[in-house]
Swiss-Prot record:
Free-text comment on this protein's domains from its UniProt entry: Consists of two distinct domains, a catalytic core and a N-terminal extension that is involved in tRNA binding.
Record-listed L-serine binding positions: T231, S232, E233, E285, T384
A GO molecular-function annotation: ATP binding
Organism: Bifidobacterium animalis subsp. lactis (strain AD011)
Record keywords: Aminoacyl-tRNA synthetase, ATP-binding, Cytoplasm, Ligase, Nucleotide-binding, Protein biosynthesis
Taxonomic superkingdom: Bacteria
Protein family per UniProt: Belongs to the class-II aminoacyl-tRNA synthetase family. Type-1 seryl-tRNA synthetase subfamily.
Function noted in UniProt: Catalyzes the attachment of serine to tRNA(Ser). Is also able to aminoacylate tRNA(Sec) with serine, to form the misacylated tRNA L-seryl-tRNA(Sec), which will be further converted into selenocysteinyl-tRNA(Sec).
Protein name: Serine--tRNA ligase
Any GO BP: seryl-tRNA aminoacylation
Pfam families in the record: Seryl_tRNA_N, tRNA-synt_2b
Coiled coil: none
Length: 428
C-alpha cells in the first residue's frame, strides 16, 4: 500500500508509475476522490457526534420545559449521526478498495516497457561450445532420465501434469544445492526459517500476490480458506505482521526453506517437458526487513548473494534489470539472474530479487521505532538463493559426452565427495 499523504502531494508521480506499469492511471484519481469523500464524511460524522454529546450534557442540567425540546433534538441528531456513520463507513470501504488496487511506485531507474524490454546489466561465464567438444548436448530431462533421477511419467500418474519425482543422485543434488544455499545465507548473517506453506488470506493479500498473481495461486476449498504459497516470501512477510521491529542494529535477514506451489495458469503449452515450469518445487528464499533509506543498498547485497551462489554451481548467466511493465505489484525494482540453457540456446530465469520498499509493510502493518518516538513502515526485500529449476542449468551445463554429469566442485562436499553422476538403469 502507498502513503496517502504522498499520493495527495505527488499524484503525478503515482500516475507516471501506473503508466509505466501499463496499469490504470485513472485509479489514482479514483483514490483521491474516495479519500476526499472519506474525510468529508468522517468530518460530518464527528461534528454531529460532538453536537449530540453536547446536547446530552445540556439535558441533564435543563429545566423541565426545556428538557423535552433537547431530547427531541437528541433523537434527531441520533438519526443524523447514524446516517453520517453509514456514509463514512461506505466511503472508507470505497477508499480502501481503491488504495489496495494501486501497485507500488516504480523506481525511476527501472527500464520502461514490458516483458521483453529488460536491460542486460552483465553476462558472466563462458558458454560451452559443444560442437567443438564433439557431441550434441542433451536436454535436462533426457539427462535426468538416463541417470535415473527425474521421473515425469510417474509424477503425472500420481498428481497430474507438471508433477515429477526426483530420485537418487538428482534428489541428492537438489538437497545439496539447497543446503549449500542455507550455509551461505547463514555465513552472511541470515536466520534460517522453515516456513508454513499455508497462509491466511490476509497475509497473501498483504504481500500483494492477490493483485497481479491471483490466478497463479492454489486456494483450499471451503470450509478452509488458506492459500498455498508460491514462495516463502509470503510467510516470512506475514511473520512480523502488526509488529514493531528494532532495526537499530541493522536489517533483519531471513532465509526461508519451503516447498512452493504454483498453478501456472498462464503457461498453457509453455515448457511442458521437464522441470522448468512445474506446480511444486523447493526453494530457499532470502527475505529482509530494512530501514527504507537502506533498501537500495540491501537490494544490491541480495543480488550479490545470488551471484555468489551461481558462481558456486558454475553456470554461465546474465543479470537483467526488469522493465516496469513486468514487475509484480509489490516490487519497485527487480533484478533477475538468468542461466544459459544449452539445448534451448537461451537464458532462463533462475533467481529474482525485488525491492518492495514500504509497500508490503504498510499493508501488513510492520513498523520500526523512529527517532521522534513514533513509528514508520519498514522496507521489505526478497531474493531467490536456490530452487528446483537450478537443476536444469546444472545438469545441462555440466553434462559430459558419455551422458554423465560432473558435479560442481563447491557442491561435492554436500554429495559425500561424489564427483560425477553416472548413467544408470532404473531400479524400479
Amino acid at each position: 500500500m502507498l502513503d496517502i499523504q504522498f499520493i495527495r502531494e505527488h499524484p503525478e508521480v503515482v500516475k507516471e508509475s501506473q503508466r509505466k506499469r501499463g496499469e490504470s492511471v485513472e485509479l489514482v484519481d479514483e483514490v483521491l476522490r474516495a479519500d476526499e469523500e472519506r474525510r468529508s464524511s468522517l468530518k460530518q460524522f464527528e461534528e454531529a457526534r460532538a453536537r449530540q454529546k453536547e446536547i446530552g450534557k445540556q439535558v441533564a442540567k435543563a429545566a423541565p420545559d426545556e428538557k423535552a425540546k433537547l431530547i427531541a433534538q437528541t433523537k434527531e441528531l441520533s438519526e443524523q449521526v447514524a446516517s453520517f456513520k453509514a456514509s463514512a463507513d461506505t466511503a472508507d470501504e470505497q477508499y480502501t478498495t481503491a488504495m489496495w488496487q494501486l501497485s507500488n511506485i516504480v523506481e525511476p531507474q527501472a527500464p520502461e516497457g514490458g516483458e521483453d524490454d529488460y536491460v542486460v546489466m552483465r553476462k558472466v561465464g563462458q558458454i560451452r561450445d559443444f560442437a567443438a567438444e564433439g557431441f550434441e548436448p542433451k536436454d535436462h530431462l533426457t539427462l535426468g532420465e538416463e541417470v535415473a533421477g527425474i521421473d515425469m511419467k510417474r509424477g503425472v500418474k500420481v498428481s497430474g501434469s507438471r508433477f515429477y519425482f526426483l530420485r537418487g543422485d538428482v534428489a541428492r543434488l537438489q538437497i545439496a544445492m539447497l543446503t549449500m544455499a542455507v550455509d551461505q545465507a547463514q555465513e552472511h548473517g541470515f536466520i534460517l526459517a522453515i516456513t508454513p506453506t499455508l497462509v491466511r488470506p490476509e497475509v497473501m493479500r498483504g504481500t500483494g500476490f492477490l493483485n497481479s498473481h491471483a490466478d497463479e495461486i492454489y486456494r483450499l476449498r471451503e470450509p478452509d480458506d488458506d492459500y498455498l504459497v508460491g514462495t516463502s516470501e509470503v510467510a516470512l512477510a506475514g511473520m512480523h505482521e502488526n509488529e514493531i521491529l528494532d532495526l537499530s542494529d541493522g536489517p533483519l535477514r531471513y532465509c526461508g526453506w519451503s516447498s512452493c506451489y504454483r498453478r501456472e495458469a498462464g503457461a498453457a503449452g509453455k515448457d511442458t517437458s521437464g522441470i522448468i515450469r512445474v506446480h511444486q518445487f523447493d526453494k530457499v528464499e532470502m527475505f529482509v526487513y530494512a530501514k527504507p533509506e537502506n533498501s537500495d543498498a540491501e537490494h544490491q547485497k541480495l543480488l550479490a548473494m545470488e551471484e555468489e551462489m551461481l558462481a558456486k554451481v558454475e553456470v554461465p548467466y546474465r543479470v537483467i534489470d526488469t522493465a516496469a511493465g513486468d514487475l509484480g505489484s509489490s516490487a519497485a525494482r527487480k533484478f533477475d539472474c538468468e542461466a544459459w540453457v544449452p539445448t534451448q540456446g537461451r537464458y532462463r530465469e533462475l533467481t529474482s530479487t525485488s525491492n518492495c520498499t514500504q509497500y508490503q509493510a504498510r499493508r501488513l502493518n510492520i513498523r520500526e521505532r523512529v527517532a521522534d518516538g513514533g513509528t514508520s513502515p519498514v522496507a521489505t526485500l526478497n531474493g531467490t538463493l536456490a530452487t528446483t529449476r537450478w537443476l536444469v542449468a546444472i545438469l545441462e551445463n555440466h553434462q559430459q559426452a558419455d551422458g554423465s554429469i560432473e558435479i560442481p566442485k563447491a557442491m561435492r562436499p554436500y554429495m559425500g565427495g561424489k564427483e560425477v553422476i553416472e548413467p544408470r538403469k532404473w531400479e524400479a
